[in-house]
Amino acid sequence: MKFLVAVDGSDASHRALDYARELAEAADASLTIVHSVDPTVYAESSPEPVSDLAEADRLYVAERVEESERRGAEILDGARGRVTDGGVDVSTSLLYGDPVVAVSDFAEENGFDAIIVGHHGVSARTEAAFGSVAKGLVSRARVPVTVVR
């Protein structure tokens, strides 16, 4: 079996990761940990992406993406360190795009048996404006999704 756990560095994603490790150990399954970097730029409190950016803004966005990639790599490294002591086969992957789309597509394309995700992530403001990743995964994913509180 193959389990996919989506993390964002929050306490909720740590709980999901701990649960996923226990589940993988019990099922003799592999565990892939993912984090999604979304390079899309949104206007404040709007679900619509900004399509027209000045060149200076494009450079700023590129810097923000690089910063997000570094942060994503740190989150994945920390998550891997949290689960490597249990004897589970663990891999990580940094994804790009909207987390709901990126994670659900990755799960389907790579034949995962289930997705495990925390109930609430790091950004309550973003969640209020756009909806939670967990809720989106439950709606969109074609494999079972376990939401950990």
What are these regions (language model features)?
Residues 1-2, 149:
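Absolute protein N-terminus
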Residues 114-139:
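Glycine-rich, Arg-bearing micro-motifs that act as flexible, cationic patches
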Residues 53-74:
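A short acidic, glycine-rich active-site loop
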Residues 32, 91, 146:
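Conserved beta-strand positions in the Rossmann-like core of class I SAM-dependent methyltransferases
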Residues 48-52, 109-111, 133-135:
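Short, hinge-like loop/turn segments at secondary-structure boundaries
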Residues 2-55:
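Small/aliphatic-rich secondary-structure junction motif
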Residues 78-115:
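Structural beta-alpha unit
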Residues 35-36, 118-120, 149:
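Short secondary-structure boundary segments
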